[in-house]
Amino acid sequence: MYSAAHHIMPQIKKKTAQTPKFARQSAEARREMLIEAGIACLAKDGILGFTIDRICVKAKVSRGLITHHFKSIDGLLAAVYATMYGKMLAVIENPSVADDATPEKRLTAIIDAMFSREFFNRESLNIWLALWGEIANNPALLKEHRKQYARYRRGIERALGAVAIARGLKIDTPLVAMMFVSLVDGLGLEWCIEPKLLSARQAREACFKLLEPILGPLQ
């Protein structure tokens, strides 16, 4: 006689194909992952490090994902630019102050944020240098720059204009905004070239020295 054991079939574990991690993520999550990898590559090696191979290695994804989500490496670079600007625009358009804060406090909060460690640091400024240096040679990046820069200027104009209105002043708001933005960009460039010559505190004070003769005391 056969024992009962002969009639029991061994259990076979079904192997399930493991889905790659990036395939289980949403399209938006994959886009963000590639953008962050691109930012990291720019911070480390500048524009020369912004290559499909390096970005894909950093993000641990296949090369085809860049083309799928951004059409080209230039499309990804434009998305990186928009992301970098987006972080700054968030504090310009929604500064960390109470809803009933005065225009002066809102403007001061914007200046403080722009020279905080979150933005005024070696990594961030190196990324900006790499991006700025590429604008003139990259049509996709130039297009994105014009869009983001216009929004940036409008945000600064609104903050300056609100102070002027509250104080009954008539100023050339677009011109003052352009002067302010140019100063901020120049200070960032100066700090990148020779950090020992300029501190974040000094850069912040330079902005007030530009604006206070026009708007009056702000601090």
Predicted regions and their residues:
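Helix-turn-helix
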Residues: 33, 37-79
